[in-house]
A protein has these predicted regions:
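Extracellular loop and loop/strand-boundary signature of outer-membrane beta-barrel proteins
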Residues: 30-31, 73-77, 118-123, 156-159
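Residues that define the transmembrane beta-barrel architecture of outer-membrane proteins
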Residues: 37-41, 80-86, 125-131, 165-169
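Outer-membrane beta-barrel "beta-signal"
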Residues: 43, 139, 165-177
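Short loop/turn motifs that connect adjacent beta-strands in outer-membrane beta-barrel proteins
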Residues: 22-24, 50-59, 95-102, 141-144
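Cleavable N-terminal export/targeting peptides
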Residues: 1-24
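Residue-level signature of outer-membrane beta-barrel architecture
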Residues: 33, 47-49, 53, 92-94, ...
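Transmembrane beta-strands of outer-membrane beta-barrel pores
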Residues: 31-37, 47-49, 65-71, 108-114, ...
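Transmembrane beta-strands of outer-membrane beta-barrel proteins
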Residues: 25-29, 57-65, 84, 102-108, ...
Length: 177
């Protein structure tokens, strides 16, 4: 059941996505795997903040707005969480190889969690930082497709205790438009 908070959060996400539509974008779907039996999906929209030709052709800066759905446990003992995030990301192309581009990326953004207790952890606050570190490969005739492996860490940076953090690995497929 959607609560008023979830509707407000979804509205905020889609407003940020609509603002982003003025730029060329990229849509991404991620499979997420966390500690224990945690898994989920992440749907994201990305748009360039700094185009490669504005600076160094190997550097790209983009913003990502996303919605995450996480689940934990079995049908008898089930837990879920809904998360919206917005994050600037710095991407660096290491090499052009096999008709594609191998890149690495880092970013720190903000997230809003629906529930502060998830998968047996109390993360204290609905607001969390979303840290990421990833590697990926861009390919296709116009480099419009990308696959990536990323590590995500969510925490409140110690603003409130407890702060155990949540860690995830994701596999992503995206298409640029």
């Amino acid at each position: 059941m959607f609560t008023l908070n979830r509707i407000a959060r979804l509205s905020l996400l889609f407003i940020s996505m609509n603002i982003a539509c003025a730029h060329a974008g990229e849509i991404s779907a991620d499979y997420i795997r966390g500690e224990g039996d945690v898994e989920g999906i992440k749907l994201a929209y990305r748009f360039d903040i700094l185009k490669t030709y504005d600076f160094d052709p190997r550097i790209k800066v983009y913003a990502e707005s996303s919605v995450n759905f996480w689940k934990y446990g079995t049908p008898e003992h089930y837990d879920s969480n809904f998360v919206v995030s917005i994050s600037p990301v710095l991407q660096y192309t290491f090499c052009e190889c096999m008709e594609g581009e191998l890149y690495g990326e880092v970013g720190i953004g903000l997230s809003l969690l629906d529930d502060t207790e998830f998968a047996g952890k109390d993360v204290s606050t609905h607001y969390q930082f979303e840290d990421r570190l990833g590697v990926g490969y861009r390919f296709g005739e116009a480099q419009e497709y990308s696959i990536a492996l990323r590590y995500f860490h969510y925490s409140n940076a110690g603003f409130k205790k407890p702060n155990p953090g949540l860690d995830f690995i994701s596999f992503s497929f995206s298409k640029a438009y």
